Regions:
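Metal-dependent nuclease catalytic cores that hydrolyze phosphodiester bonds in DNA/RNA
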Residues: 1-64, 70-77, 84
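Extended aliphatic helical segments
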Residues: 5-12, 34, 38-40, 88, ...
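Short amphipathic alpha-helical face segments that pack within enzyme cores
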Residues: 18, 22, 88-92, 96
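Short, small-residue-rich loop/turn micro-motifs
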Residues: 68-69, 108
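Metal-dependent nuclease catalytic regions and adjoining charged, substrate-binding loops involved
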Residues: 77-83, 92, 96-160
């Protein structure tokens, strides 16, 4: 529920939304835009998400484009590849839509500079994602600590 999300987190998501709006205009102007906010879903294991953009690509019929806004320090730390969790997200989308190629594009929140990293579909990574989902879904005991990201709701959960 949107109202239960911390106001600061809501502002972070809103900032990302303005990036998507601007990018849509740029993609349309460059005649690269095909579609946006495309929902994808896998039944088993249950995985769902929303692809930011599907764009035209000169070497592929089309490509997936995921947009991320990122703070200055993290932006400068990105050298060779996208953040692992963003690569995983794009791998899921590539595999669920049977596409071979995508891009994660970052916008620096401080100065709007951009960095983009290509991601090729990787069957091994997809297999590992499915194995991890299966492992989590079949756990019989709760983990002692949460290993999720800082925003994971499990971080604040206390064992009773």
């Amino acid at each position: 529920d949107w109202d239960s999300i911390d106001a600061r987190i809501q502002r972070i998501f809103d900032h990302g939304g303005t990036f998507e709006g601007r990018m849509k205009k740029y993609l349309e102007k460059a005649d690269l835009y095909i579609d946006d906010e495309v929902s994808v879903k896998n039944e088993n294991p249950p995985i769902s998400g929303r692809i930011d953009f599907i764009i035209k690509h000169d070497k592929h019929t089309d490509a997936l484009l995921e947009l991320k806004t990122i703070k200055n320090e993290d932006f400068h730390d990105l050298k060779e590849a996208p953040k692992h969790e963003h690569m995983i997200q794009l791998q899921i989308y590539l595999n669920l839509t049977d596409r071979d190629y995508g891009v994660v594009m970052y916008e620096n929140k401080n100065d709007q500079n951009l960095k983009a990293f290509k991601v090729d579909r990787d069957e091994k990574v997809w297999h590992d994602i499915l194995k991890r989902c299966e492992k989590i879904m079949t756990m019989t005991t709760e983990p002692e600590t949460c290993t999720g990201m800082w925003y994971c709701k499990c971080k604040n959960r206390r064992k009773e």
